[in-house]
Amino acid sequence: MHICILSGSTLGGAEYVAEHLNDVLETQGFSTALFHGPNLSDIENEKIWLVVTSTHGAGELPDNLKPLFDELANSQKDFSDVRFAVVGLGSSDYDTFCYAADKVEQTLQAKSAVKICETLKIDVLNVDDQESYAEEWLPSFIEGLK
């Protein structure tokens, strides 16, 4: 089974989590492709998306992921054959905590993509080891693939 991992990061935290999940999935025998800020044309044939994103500014997607989701929102393509999950990183100090993860989820569902498990929202204020925290969530993602 092939999994496309997309990361959007401003300070690198989401990128580190995405790379860690990529390594864990490969160790478990999955085929993966890891993209840091892809274009839609890079991933339009991928059927399983794991999106790992931080929240930037006033609840925005990071600059390296925003163009993809703008393009996706404006696309006429049917994404009903795409299954996805989202991992969001943010700070609960802000009222826009993990808004980028919410935007990713809403955009994909508006395009008929199928969410396969609950979104993981990591509060960077309370979780020191975000990579391990995300790894603990990974079995629910894998279960959703079945």
Curated annotation (Swiss-Prot):
Domain Flavodoxin-like: 3-142
Keyword tags: Electron transport, Flavoprotein, FMN, Transport
Xref: PROSITE patterns: FLAVODOXIN_LIKE
One annotated GO molecular function: FMN binding
Coiled-coil annotated spans: none
Names of the cofactor(s): FMN
Any single Pfam family the record assigns to this protein: Flavodoxin_1
PANTHER family (UniProt xref): NADPH OXIDOREDUCTASE A, NITRIC OXIDE SYNTHASE-RELATED
Family membership noted in the UniProt record: Belongs to the flavodoxin family. MioC subfamily.
Purpose: Probable electron transporter required for biotin synthase activity.
Protein name: Protein MioC homolog
Organism in which the protein naturally occurs: Haemophilus influenzae (strain ATCC 51907 / DSM 11121 / KW20 / Rd)
Gene: mioC
